Swiss-Prot record:
It is an enzyme of class 4 (lyase). Belongs to the sugar phosphate cyclases superfamily. Dehydroquinate synthase family. NCBIfam families: aroB (TIGR01357). HAMAP family: DHQ_synthase. Its cofactor is Co(2+); Zn(2+); NAD(+). One of its GO terms (cellular component) is cytoplasm. Binds 1 divalent metal cation per subunit. Can use either Co(2+) or Zn(2+). Zn(2+) binds at E185, H246, H263. NAD(+) binds at G106, V107, V108, G109, D110, T130, S131, K143, K152. One of its GO terms (molecular function) is nucleotide binding. The keyword Nucleotide-binding applies. GO terms for biological process: amino acid biosynthetic process; aromatic amino acid family biosynthetic process; chorismate biosynthetic process. This is 3-dehydroquinate synthase.
């Protein structure tokens, strides 16, 4: 088993990475909690594949278990779904010492974490991420949120789980689209902090070969996030590097109402578009844009900006959480494995993103 300890101001917790760990979660929890009441929040797709294994593990260890199952996808990450979760928690008479387990991808994790952070002013919760994207990124670091009609993750909090259990075996059931979705975030880590990730992905022929190294890949990504979260828990400085590609990605996702592009696909477009701009400005080393396009394309990710309303995209960026006063922080790549934070005035964002439109 690979383990990573996260140490932040409010608490410390462990990320445990092991094939087959899903079947032993009950055993691992029974000596930690006095309460034997658990609510598992999941989605209807994940429930079909993995609930039975988790359920057996919990029941065999003496826990009682209730299930809250939501519809899969970003469209469920809203206040209406959150209210239904609260309603179920009340119906199940969940108390502060009881436990929420988030079993699912990024949407389930964000929604479950925010519910746990606010219900009874905070109850225990555990992350069991089942998508590659959630395993390398969203299950770690304490950011939990729901979307509003005006943008992504606009209502949220910082609330760390008590533990994160990552079972790479669950990735074997991912279809190619969801695998590629997670690879968008994996490739991001390579470009912002660790070129060895890119070298490994370059050397692999296909998805099956990547899965042979997946524990090491997950460990590398989680270690990078641990370092940045511990240095900057509240996302006010260096942690913003994790948002490379995300400023554009969130705008793209919202523009298409979370239907056309997955999060990882939108991040891939955002990274590629931004790197093309900064390479032309001589901020980024020549050849980086083509290198990025090649590795993203290899893993089934889009690299071309869709034909969309440019002003609508810029307007959504103004609501981005990385904006401060009249400026926004944008993450740019200097070369593969090295990035920096640039500050741009909000009134200059359109010209920065679409210089060909400025005469």
């Amino acid at each position: 088993m690979k383990a990573i300890d996260i140490n932040v101001k409010e608490k410390s917790y462990k990320i445990s990475i092991k094939k087959g760990i899903l079947s032993s979660i009950g055993e691992r929890l029974k000596t930690t909690y006095q309460s034997r009441n658990i609510v598992v929040i999941t989605d209807t797709n994940v429930e079909k594949f993995y609930m039975e294994t988790l359920k057996n593990s919990l029941l065999e260890s003496g826990f009682t278990m209730k299930i809250i199952s939501i519809e899969p996808g970003e469209k469920s990450k809203n206040l209406a779904t959150l209210e239904r979760v609260y309603e179920k928690l009340c119906e199940f008479q969940i108390r502060r010492k009881d436990i929420i387990i988030s079993l699912g991808g990024g949407v389930v994790g964000d929604l479950s974490g925010f519910a746990a952070s606010t219900y009874l002013r905070g109850i225990n919760y555990i992350q069991v991420p089942t998508s590659l994207l959630a395993q390398v990124d969203s299950s770690i670091g304490g950011k939990v949120a729901v979307d509003l009609p005006w943008g992504k993750n606009l209502v949220g909090s910082f609330y760390h789980p008590d533990a994160v259990f990552i079972d790479p075996d669950v990735l074997l059931s991912l279809n190619d689209k969801f695998f590629s979705d997670g690879m968008g975030e994996v490739i991001k880590y390579g470009f912002i902090k660790d070129k060895s990730i890119l070298n490994l992905l370059d050397s692999c022929k296909d998805k099956d070969e990547v899965l042979q190294y997946i524990e090491d890949i997950i460990y590398k990504c989680c270690s990078i996030k641990k370092h940045l979260v511990e240095k900057d828990e509240r996302d006010l400085g260096e942690r913003m590097m994790l948002n490379f590609g995300h400023t554009l990605a969130h705008g793209i996702e919202k523009y298409y109402n979370y239907g056309k592009y997955s999060h990882g696909e939108a991040v891939a477009i955002g990274m590629t578009y931004m790197t093309n701009i900064t390479e032309r400005m001589d901020i980024t080393k020549k050849g980086t844009h083509d290198y990025m396009k090649g590795i993203l394309t290899k893993y089934g990710l889009p690299v071309n900006m869709p034909d969309m309303d440019k002003q609508a995209l810029v307007n959504s960026i103004a609501l981005d959480k990385k904006s401060s006063g009249d400026r926004i922080n944008i993450i740019v790549i200097e070369e593969a494995g090295i990035c920096k934070i640039m500050k741009i005035k909000l009134r200059e964002v359109y010209g920065f993103l679409f210089p060909e439109d400025i005469i």
